[in-house]
Amino acid sequence: MERILDGDLVVHFKGKYYEVLSTNAHYSEDHSLRLVVYKSRDTGDIWVRPYDMFMSKVDKIKYPEADQEYRFEVAMRV
């Protein structure tokens, strides 16, 4: 898996595109929970997801039609 960087344009395995705003956010005082903040290119909505979940592999049993190996993959590096 290619490392995700701030500013990257990523594609979700379901086909939507997102801009990564931050890969170094933390929840409150718990600095062990790293978060990714990202913005929908379609709606402008802001989303936050734990880094490990953001970088996880697609469940091919649940989504056998998915072409991507990972939940999010780099579409364009800015």
Segments (PLM) and residue ranges:
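Mixed-charge, low-complexity intrinsically disordered regions
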Residues: 1-78
